[in-house]
């Protein structure tokens, strides 16, 4: 049986932790940051786990 290919867009956006959780970046931290409070941009820096409802779909895209 052939190997599954990783969806390249998903491969760039998500990473799998050592325990198998899927992590993603938060939105709203690419541009137009001047008017956003520093507190908000600091909090947006951290990665967060993918929602449970989306995890199965993302795993399929990542070929896992």
From Swiss-Prot:
Name of one Pfam family that matches: Ribosomal_L35p
The keyword Oxidoreductase appears for this protein: no
Keyword Lipoprotein in record: no
Any one GO MF annotation of this record: structural constituent of ribosome
GO biological process: translation
SUPFAM superfamilies tied to this protein: L35p-like
GO cellular component, one term: cytosolic large ribosomal subunit
InterPro entries assigned: Ribosomal_bL35, Ribosomal_bL35-like, Ribosomal_bL35_CS, Ribosomal_bL35_sf
Alphabetical keyword list: Ribonucleoprotein, Ribosomal protein
Family the entry assigns: Belongs to the bacterial ribosomal protein bL35 family.
The protein's name in its UniProt record: Large ribosomal subunit protein bL35
Originating organism: Acidothermus cellulolyticus (strain ATCC 43068 / DSM 8971 / 11B)
Source organism phylogeny: Bacteria, Bacillati, Actinomycetota, Actinomycetes, Acidothermales
């Amino acid at each position: 049986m052939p190997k599954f290919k990783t969806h390249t867009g998903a491969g760039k956006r998500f990473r799998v932790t050592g325990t198998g959780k899927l992590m993603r970046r938060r939105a709203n931290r690419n541009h137009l940051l001047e008017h956003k409070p520093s507190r908000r941009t600091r909090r947006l820096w951290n990665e967060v786990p993918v929602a449970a409802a989306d995890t199965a779909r993302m795993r399929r895209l990542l070929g896992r």
